[in-house]
């Protein structure tokens, strides 16, 4: 991880206030983001963007192009990762490692909630930054147990 971060730090820059037009263009060009967020919840997304969502972008220092984005919500001193995305070029250049490391090093954030992963490779990636598995309780009931509902 240290070697990858050293390389990424020399090739990438962190941008927190990417221009609105450039951000829209970048996010709209992502098929996954388009299908999961914009097609179903565009009005909610843009409203949240103005109030609660935070973004980190990994920018190529030579071309000034965004290679990755890390979307999160910050509440108090806790950051909740919502949508980490890396382009193919960003993957080659460790852009997500660069962004997560920047988030972890942010003094205004004490806890980063990686929002878990059932995919081992992703869970292992997050573990490099100190993520630990957290078990959560769930409650499930059948309506037949509650005949008056």
Set out the residue ranges of the language-model regions:
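Aromatic (often tryptophan-rich) hydrophobic motifs at membrane interfaces
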Residues: 52-147
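A conserved beta-strand-loop-helix scaffold within acyl/acetyltransferase catalytic domains
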Residues: 1-91, 128
């Amino acid at each position: 991880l240290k070697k990858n971060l050293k390389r990424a730090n020399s090739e990438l820059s962190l941008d927190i206030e990417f221009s609105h037009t450039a951000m829209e263009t970048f996010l709209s060009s992502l098929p996954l983001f388009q299908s999961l967020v914009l097609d179903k919840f565009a009005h909610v997304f843009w409203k949240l963007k103005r109030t609660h969502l935070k973004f980190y972008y990994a920018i190529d220092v030579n071309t000034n192009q965004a290679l990755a984005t890390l979307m999160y919500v910050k509440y108090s001193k806790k950051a909740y990762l919502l949508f980490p995305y890396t382009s193919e070029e960003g993957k080659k250049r460790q852009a997500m490692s660069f962004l997560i490391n920047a988030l972890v090093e942010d003094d205004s954030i004490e806890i980063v909630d990686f929002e878990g992963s059932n995919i081992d490779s992703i869970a292992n990636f997050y573990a490099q930054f100190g993520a630990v598995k957290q078990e959560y309780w769930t409650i499930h009931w059948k309506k037949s147990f509650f005949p008056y509902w």
